[in-house]
Amino acid sequence: MIGYRQTLLVFLLMMLSGAAIAQNNTNSPYTRYGYGQLADQGSGNSKAMGGIAYGLRDKYQVNFANPASYTAIDSLTFIFDGGISLQNTNFSNGTIKQNAKNSSFDYITMQFRLGKWAAMSLGLLPYSNVGYSMAEYKEDTDYPSQSSALQYYGDGGLHQLYLGAGFKVLKNLSVGANISYFWGDITHTRAITFPGNSSTLPLTTITGTSIQSYKLDIGAQYTQVFGKKHEATLGIVFSPGHDLNNDSYVEDRLGNEKTGTTVCIELDHLR
């Protein structure tokens, strides 16, 4: 059995690593929509096999995509797993090309045996990421003073802390469940300025959303053995849907903060 001191030490390491996971390491204009770019909900072992996860069952790997897989671990094993990803992306609009390189600390998980028929896992991983910065200049040749510069940028994302357990109910059948806590803040900003007209104040619109909610995943795995060396595992996961609890606002700022001429208008909270 795993000692409580060792478990506590690993849990503290997970919390310290949460600061690295919470950092935004995304640079994509597509994250403007929805909750941003959804993170790949899979471990390194799952990604190496093309994203397959529900049927994976390995006593040396944490498969948090299906909590029924936790029972594969033996009583002498304690698993502490982390993931890092690197991304190299090229963007093009037909005339302009841009390259973006990003790195991120994907997940921190641990898994251990509770008893002969039960095992537990907990971990911290990202759920979505928002990160972009774009600019557009609209030139008015007839009235240069009305030429405008638009800027769009956003950041934030959602994070997921889960606790799960798996149980072996029959020799070849295991079931399990993960309960996850979601939290995060997402901010989108749109700014318009008029470089050729100093008398026209710039306008900045900030849309922010703060989310705190939960997620439940229920999984099952059935393993059929063929001979002495081969077996096949069928996995299934059910996640009940529900609305995320969120607190949103829209704020308009009229003026130039450098000169101190700023007017803030905060609208009613959106639910």
How does the language model describe each region?
Residues 23-48, 113-271:
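Outer-membrane beta-barrel porins/channels
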Residues 6, 11, 36-39, 54, ...:
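Generic hydrophobic alpha-helical membrane-segment signal
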Residues 10, 57-58, 130, 183:
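Residue-level recognition of conserved structural "scaffold" positions that shape functional pockets
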Residues 1-27:
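Bacterial Sec-dependent N-terminal signal peptides
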Residues 21-128:
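N-terminal, post-signal peptide beta-strand-biased segments of exported outer-membrane/organellar beta-barrel
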